[in-house]
Amino acid sequence: NGDNFLNNQNLFFGAMEYYYDNGFTYIELGDGDELWENRKMCPIIETHSDAFWIMSKFYRANRMYMLYGNHDAVKSRPSFIKKHCNHYYCDSVRGCLPLFPGIQIHQSLILEDSEKRRLFLVHGHQGNLLNDQLWPLARFLVRYVWRPLELVGFLAPTGAGRPNKKKDRIERELAAFA
């Protein structure tokens, strides 16, 4: 079916319940929603309503931060957030429920502990021309070329197979970005 999250949905929900019950904060580091392969947010929320329900619990408890990545860069637009992230339709109550009303979705986040030590969080696509500046082109290629190939069984040619030189260059650029 092309849904890479479906097989892990129950594992995600169980982990999120544990983290919520034990006082953790949830930080989504981008690409939480595959918006290159999928044109709309609504079917994602409908399919994974349990995941969005528990994420909304974190949000209501002020224990959630969301960053956007290259695959969900449209979340950087306030108009997208207002239209797709404020509420969702819940079948069990046959009506709309709050999702993340008023959420701000950022490109990066700095955490600071009581000793003033800082940790810089970012999705990681920054510094890569295709995934950062040319993401609309990359989205087109994924949506209309890669996804159909994936549906017939081709494996992703990205990720860990990158040459070390390229990884080192991107790491230097991200350090400069920080």
Q: How should these model regions be labeled?
A:
Residues N1-E28, G32-A178:
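Extended recognition/assembly regions associated with phosphoester-bond processing machinery
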